[in-house]
Amino acid sequence: IPLGLNEFLFAGTWAVPRYIGEGSLDRLLLRPLSTIFSIMAADVTLHGLGSVLFGLAVCIYSLVQLELVLSPLMVLFWICAILCGTLIQYALNMLMATLSFWVINSQSAMVLVQNISEFSKYPIAIYQKGLQLFLSFVVPYAFCSFYPSSFLLGVHTDLIYWAGPFLAAGVMLLISWAFWRFALSQYQSAGG
């Protein structure tokens, strides 16, 4: 679900290299709105809605099959965890897109990081410890699915399982925004 929401709401991150390369970022910098908001608002697509709907259907089917009844508090946690997962994916894409200020095209890095998200489709417990740490603390895709799911299913109730998605989303957003602001401070217009 977070991947679909990211594709729906934040497809604009994929346009950042183009804006920088073509010099059209200059036009956005002159607007009174946030540059990031302008980029995201320009490229909202319906592309990810299919993933969101399919993900919701799978979740509902799974809840029925497991005969799992979620309390209102757990439903609220689930919604917040989905939003946190979406923000984590956005922040990772934005970090890679921001590299376009220094390299010709950072879309290869964006694709690489998005491909790493494939690891989060499986429980991270099946991976070696190094990869578990990488997926938890370097490229924190584990907080998009594994940790929240483990908490919702009652498998794990440790602090990292319920608070981790919120912390990971907050930290990743702060890092990506700081990197973006640093890149903007170093930016020289395409004209000079």
Specify the residue positions occupied by each region the protein language model found:
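Hydrophobic alpha-helical transmembrane segments of multi-pass membrane transport proteins
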Residues: I1-F54
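Membrane-embedded alpha-helical segments of multi-pass transporters/permeases
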Residues: F8, L56-C59, L63, Y90, ...
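Hydrophobic alpha-helical transmembrane segments of polytopic membrane proteins
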Residues: L76-T98, L167-S176
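Membrane-spanning helices that line or support transport/gating and their immediate boundary helices
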Residues: G12-A15, Y19, A91-T98, W102, ...
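Hydrophobic alpha-helical transmembrane segments in multi-pass membrane proteins
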Residues: H47-C59, Q89-N93, F137, Y141-A142
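Membrane-interfacial helix-loop-helix connectors in multipass membrane proteins
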Residues: A57-A81, S150-W162
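Junction motif at the cytosolic side of a transmembrane helix
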Residues: L167-G192
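Transmembrane helix segments
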Residues: N93, A97-F151
